A protein has these predicted regions:
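Residues within HEAT/ARM-like alpha-solenoid scaffolds
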Residues: 4, 43, 63, 78, ...
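Intrinsically disordered, low-complexity, charge-biased linker/tail regions
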Residues: 34-54, 63, 197-207, 218
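Inward-facing hydrophobic residues that define packing positions of alpha-helical scaffold repeats
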Residues: 5-6, 160, 164, 206, ...
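Structural detector for internal amphipathic alpha-helices that build alpha-solenoid repeat scaffolds
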Residues: 7-11, 21-25, 38-41, 47-59, ...
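TPR-adjacent "capping" and linker segments in tetratricopeptide-repeat scaffold/adaptor proteins
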Residues: 51-63, 67-71, 185-197, 235-237
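Short coil/linker segments at helix-helix boundaries
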Residues: 25, 29, 193-196, 201-247
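Solenoid-repeat scaffolds in large eukaryotic assemblies
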Residues: 2-5, 9, 18, 95, ...
Length: 248
């Protein structure tokens, strides 16, 4: 009976949007199980592959993501919560779209709720937000610092030293960096303590103590600020070279 139902669904030739709705309704886990269950082969695997591919594509559609970012400022808490859930599903594509909105001064009225949504998305936002610290946009940097502090992100610690002590930092960034470090390491370092910490951290990097695990092919992805795109972008480095990049 189930196999006949699968055959009927395949015969309908549902478009990507309809497939996405189907996956949202029954859950992606059902399709992963369907793909692995030999009782329903080959139709089950065919349907599962098509449905999951469509869901992946739809979740990351730029127009859909842009609409979800707009919905973060909807007066309805339930609509905002659903938008955050859908943005989480879209992954890094959504994070970058949200950062682009934070960098847009014309959308300043939306910034607080967008920043809160980034915080609620959790770990996935950390590396792109660290990349934002290379921006020349003080408003964006302040939001990034505040979110990293709220997430209590240890790997952000060395990147917060510069805005804390640089004479070029506006007061707002100095205060934000101090508050973030207080949240992360439960203390605000003196300048001499910070210098000792950075020297020690550089030595650790050269000894191979990298901020993240290398992938199977021996590479590591760093998010760095792209001055032309005015966004953080992922850059893949050989793990052996990352110490030089991070230390710089």
């Amino acid at each position: 009976e189930a196999k006949k139902y699968i055959q009927k669904l395949l015969a309908l030739k549902l478009n990507d949007e309809a497939m996405y709705v189907l996956v949202r309704k029954v859950g992606s886990g059902v399709f992963f199980k369907l793909s692995a269950d030999k009782r329903y082969h080959p139709e089950g695997a065919e349907l599962a592959t098509a449905a999951l591919a469509a869901a992946h594509k739809q979740a990351r559609d730029p127009k859909r993501i842009a609409q979800l970012v707009t919905e973060l400022n909807n007066p309805s808490p339930s609509i905002r919560a659903l938008a955050i859930s859908d943005l989480k599903e879209a992954g890094y594509d959504a994070v970058i779209a949200m950062i682009a909105a934070l960098a847009d001064d014309n959308r300043a009225a939306e910034h607080d709720r967008i920043a809160n949504a980034l915080f609620l998305m959790g770990e996935i936002v950390i590396d792109p937000l660290i990349g934002c610290l290379g921006s020349d946009n003080p408003r964006l940097k302040k939001h990034a610092i505040e979110i990293l502090g709220q997430l209590e992100t240890p790997q952000a610690t060395p990147y917060l030293i510069y805005p804390l002590f640089s004479e070029a930092s506006p007061q707002s960034l100095t205060v934000a960096a101090a508050e973030a470090l207080q949240q992360i390491v439960r203390a605000v370092p003196t300048e001499s303590d910070a210098q000792r910490y950075l020297r020690r951290r550089v030595a650790q990097l050269y000894d191979g103590d990298l901020p993240q695990q290398a992938s199977a092919d021996g590479t590591i992805t760093l998010w760095l600020w792209h001055p032309e795109k005015k966004l953080p972008v992922p850059i893949v480095h050989d793990a052996q070279d990352e110490a030089l990049v991070v230390a710089a």
